[in-house]
């Protein structure tokens, strides 16, 4: 049996959102992540704890969170998978459902299958 990604669609969505909001990786406040995702601050706080336990996020003082080196590499890799999944799924899904479908697909597939979706 092939191993699938250990990241959930929600984990991936948070990593990619953090990457997009904090391009220089100086740290981002949880309230900014909550606003971008339409989530509550407690939900974001819980996810930051989860991602920190996985080694993807470092929680800093004053509610700042930054992607670790591993988090940056993972977010970069998954951003390519996400873009490829969106290209693949766009004909079958409305704009409203496309993001959810893309995150679900990349969370469900093993990484070698995701790599085959990415050109070059």
Indicate residue ranges for each PLM-predicted region:
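Short alpha-helical segments that sit at the start of domains
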Residues: 1-15
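Short acidic, hydrophobic short linear motifs in intrinsically disordered regions
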Residues: 24-34
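Key DNA-contact positions within bacterial/archaeal DNA-binding proteins
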Residues: 42-45
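Short, hydrophobic-biased segments on the C-terminal half of alpha helices
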Residues: 48-49
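A short, conserved structural fragment
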Residues: 52-62
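Basic, amphipathic "hinge/linker" alpha-helix immediately C-terminal to the N-terminal HTH DNA-binding motif
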Residues: 63-81
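Amphipathic alpha-helical dimerization/coiled-coil segments
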Residues: 83-120
